[in-house]
Amino acid sequence: MKFVDEASILVVAGDGGNGCVSFRREKYIPKGGPDGGDGGDGGDVWMEADENLNTLIDYRFEKSFRAERGQNGASRDCTGKRGKDVTIKVPVGTRVIDQGTGETMGDMTKHGQRLLVAKGGWHGLGNTRFKSSVNRTPRQKTNGTPGDKRELLLELMLLADVGMLGMPNAGKSTFIRAVSAAKPKVADYPFTTLVPSLGVVRMDNEKSFVVADIPGLIEGAAEGAGLGIRFLKHLERCRVLLHLIDIDPIDGTDPVENARIIISELEKYSQDLAAKPRWLVFNKIDLLDKAEAEEKAKAIAEALGWEDKYYLISAASGLGVKDLCWDVMTFILENPVVQAEEAKQPEKVEFMWDDYHRQQLEEIAEEDDEDWDDDWDEDDEEGVEFIYKR
């Protein structure tokens, strides 16, 4: 199935049903009073994360989702039926962005997680609601309010522990094939990898981690060269980045300059991503003698000002791969996922009609208070007595 990691959709919640103006009319019951019912609320639009999905391709074809309108109120105080909700299923790892405001509405990071993206309109009030001591036959009602309407951008971001960085043909896909059951395409030409892929690395029966392979970066990727930097977003949730460097490029390019290009493009994309833990991994050491490979790797690390540990591996032959994977596993166990995103309270998404009914009922109560004569005195008794005499 084709991998699609971005899609734009339109979501429209249902309008609220209108209130009803009606009066009770039955035999032997004159002046029965108002009995108009309220309308029904409009249906909502929800997002739901589903671990069985892995692409947004469905939403390249189906782009509009509309919830059902609430039914109007009826006589005999009958309330209209609520509109049916609409649930849109997306892959785990999808970020939902309101294109109108640029606001991130939520990240769908767990299976079964639900997110309200468009709230249905409030129901209108029937004339029964407006009955008071001074208005026994109200003829006013309110209409239902329109449902929310939003244009959303869905961004699928892979959930992985380890992310792979490097120039095209650095050996990223060969590495992920060597350590997992994933089988990305491998060939001797640039941009063999066109879409991100995931692999699960199982160290033993209880320990494993997920590694993400993305298409290679080239100079000017931030300006759109090559495949651009659109796939770097898939590394934002990774805990550690493995920067693969071809120690002996077949095209004769300088490994130091290649590494600097990757670092530069990373910083242009996001300072947060550039600040993530990054490990230097020299690949294809089987093409050189051991001593020559070690000497060349040391020279490259010094030229980059690299003072931390670095690794020498051959993804094709498996040399040094197992030790690297165990060190990655140890790092992941010692640095569990920080629940900063969950602990941080997301900004409240404002819906159009959150306080609509409360405000309406408060206004009605204020009108009743104004009509009520609460400054009773002896001068008012004549009026009351006269009414009773008639």
Curated annotation (Swiss-Prot):
Q: Which GO terms describe its biological process?
A: ribosome biogenesis
State the UniProt keywords alphabetically.
Answer: Cytoplasm, GTP-binding, Hydrolase, Magnesium, Metal-binding, Nucleotide-binding
Question: Which lineage?
Answer: Bacteria, Pseudomonadati, Pseudomonadota, Gammaproteobacteria, Enterobacterales
Q: Give every OBG-type G domain span.
A: 160-333
What domain of life is recorded for the organism? Bacteria
Q: Where does GTP bind?
A: 166-173, 191-195, 213-216, 283-286, 314-316
In this chain, composition skew of type Polar residues spans 129-145
Q: Which NCBIfam families is this protein grouped with?
A: Obg_CgtA, PRK12297.1, PRK12299.1
Quote the protein name from its UniProt record.
GTPase Obg
Tell me the subunit arrangement: Monomer.
Q: Which organism is it from?
A: Shigella sonnei (strain Ss046)
The subcellular localization recorded is:
Cytoplasm
Recorded family membership: Belongs to the TRAFAC class OBG-HflX-like GTPase superfamily. OBG GTPase family.
Chain's role? An essential GTPase which binds GTP, GDP and possibly (p)ppGpp with moderate affinity, with high nucleotide exchange rates and a fairly low GTP hydrolysis rate. Plays a role in control of the cell cycle, stress response, ribosome biogenesis and in those bacteria that undergo differentiation, in morphogenesis control.
